[in-house]
Amino acid sequence: MDLIWELPRIVKKGRERAEKILNKDYEDPIIQQMIILSDTRNRQDILTEEWINQLYSGDNLIIIEKLLKLGYREKFDLIYIDPPFLTNANYKGRIVIKTNNTKETLEYLAYRDTWEKGFIGYLEMIYIRLFLLKELLSPKGTIYVHLDYRTVHYVKILMDEIFGRENFLNEVIWAYKSGGTSNRYFSRKHDNILVYSKTKDYIFNPQLEKSYNRGLKPYRLKGVEEFQDDIGWYTLVKLKDVWQIDMVGRTSRERVGYDTQKPEKLLERIILTSSDEGSLIGDFFAGSGTTGVIAEKYDRKWIMVDKGGLSLTTINKRLIENQSQSY
C-alpha cells in the first residue's frame, strides 16, 4: 500500500497506543538500572546525593512509560535521540583477544536496523515514542531528532502532527567529509537533525562560531572585534543551521569503537544551546553515550537508555574512565 495512504493510520494507531499507555494503571516492569562507580567514588557517596544519573538497559518504550509513571512528566529540558536510520543493515561489534604474541578479532551482532514491516514498521515505532517523549519534555524543553535522508522527510510530518508545525525550530544540517563516493549520485555528506520545542518559551542560549574574513585579512571595522588563528582573521557570529563538524575518525582521541558514535562537539553545541546548568537531559537511543559524557561535563543531569549489549558495555567503560558521577 502507498505510504501516503498509510500515514493517517500510523498516526491514529500510534496515538491510541500512546494514550492507552498514559491512561492505564502502571505495573512496574523488571528493568535493569545500572549503578556503577568510577574509581573515585564509593557507595556511601551515592546514598547522600540528591540526584543520581540513570542508565537503563531495555526497550526504551517500556522505560519511557516507567519514567512517566515515576513523576518525570515535564521534567526534561532537553531530549536528544539518534534512532536507527532504516539502513536495513546489521551493525557489528568487535572484540580483540590477545593470546601470547597474537591478536584475534572476533565480530558479533551489536544491533539490527531492519524492520519486519519495512518503512511502515519504522514509522510506527518512532511515532509512539515521539508522542510519549513530548510528555516528558518540560514547558521550556526542546527535542532534537537525529536522522538522515532515508527518513527525515517522513518523520517531520509525524513531528508536525505531534508537536505542531508552529513549534518547529530548525532542520540542522550536520555536514562532514567522511563517507564514500558514487558515480551515480552526489556523495552524501550530511545528516539531518529536526529541532522542535514544546512551547514558545523554550531554552535557547545562542552559541558562537568563527566566520573567516574575506581574504583572511583583518577588516579593522570600528566596533567589530576580530581574532586571528593559524588560518587567518575571523569574527565570532551566532551559530547557523549548517554545522561543519568532522566525524569521529579512526585515529580520533575520543573514538570508542562504536560504529555510529557521534562527535562530542556535536552534542556540546546541542546541550549548551538548549539546556542550562542543572537541566535534566534524556537520550533514549544512547549508543556510545556521548550525550551523558557531555551533559556531565557541563553540569547537567542525564538519563540514558539503550538495549544493545555493546552500547551498554561501551557507555559503562566510557563513563568509568571519565570518572563520572554515580549512575
Task: Give the predicted meaning of each segment.
Residues 75-77, 168, 278:
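Local beta-strand N-terminus motif with an aromatic residue
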Residues 1-132, 140, 144, 150, ...:
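DnaQ-like (DEDDh/DEDDy) 3′-5′ exonuclease domain used for proofreading
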Residues 153-174:
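Conserved Class I S-adenosyl-L-methionine
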Residues 176-248, 252:
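Flexible, glycine-/basic-rich loop-and-beta segments that form/coincide
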Residues 132, 137-143, 277-278, 298:
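Short glycine-dipeptide loop
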Residues 252-266:
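Conserved SAM-binding loop and adjacent beta-strand
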Residues 3, 263-327:
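Conserved S-adenosyl-L-methionine
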Residues 69-72, 135-136, 270-276:
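Glycine-rich helix-loop-beta junction characteristic of Rossmann-like nucleotide cofactor-binding loops
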